[in-house]
């Protein structure tokens, strides 16, 4: 690891409670909340795009962000797009040190192509707290047994 890499790794991020937004072009738009108590900030498409039926696409927002310290940004579906058009999001974690363009992966679960116009709300950005825990390797004996044990994937009930 070079000294430049080490200094970047040790870089201290500015302490803030603001979501900072850089508009990368005139097509970028500052995220907005649909209501005062909305959990997420609406993200806007910076381009016209088509998400094919049963397909996926990567949609540009032309923004970069800095999330508040102790959080990350999660790109989540908009409920109206999910219910009315079968549109969901994927691969949506934006780390606190990411400075590239925010892009949105959209999946179309419907039978019809989904048309996006420049300026359409396509997803929402939810800020979530994160715990950066130390990692400690343990022995099998230290792995406490629980009532559930190794049961997974529906093991706790049928419904």
From Swiss-Prot:
CDD domains hit by this protein? trimeric_dUTPase
**What biological processes does GO assign it?**
dITP catabolic process; dUMP biosynthetic process; dUTP catabolic process
* Species, as recorded: Candida albicans (strain SC5314 / ATCC MYA-2876) (Yeast)
Reactions it catalyzes:
dUTP + H2O = dUMP + diphosphate + H(+)
Assembly and partners? Homotrimer.
Q: Does the keyword Kinase apply?
A: no
Enzyme category, top tier: hydrolase
One family from Pfam that matches here is: dUTPase
Q: Which UniProt keywords apply?
A: Hydrolase, Magnesium, Metal-binding, Nucleotide metabolism
Organism classification, top ranks? Answer: Eukaryota, Fungi, Dikarya, Ascomycota, Saccharomycotina
Q: Can the keyword Metal-binding be found in this entry's annotation?
A: yes
**Which co-factors does it depend on?**
Mg(2+)
- Gene Ontology MF, one: magnesium ion binding
Enzyme Commission no: 3.6.1.23
Q: What is this protein called?
A: Deoxyuridine 5'-triphosphate nucleotidohydrolase
Annotated binding of dUMP, by residue: 79, 92, 95, 98, 103, 148, 153-154
Similarity field: Belongs to the dUTPase family.
Q: In which pathway does it act?
A: Pyrimidine metabolism; dUMP biosynthesis; dUMP from dCTP (dUTP route): step 2/2
InterPro entries in the record? dUTPase (IPR008181), dUTPase-like (IPR029054), dUTPase-like_sf (IPR036157), dUTPase_trimeric (IPR033704)
- Which positions, given as ranges, span the membrane? none
What's this protein's function? Involved in nucleotide metabolism via production of dUMP, the immediate precursor of thymidine nucleotides, and decreases the intracellular concentration of dUTP so that uracil cannot be incorporated into DNA.
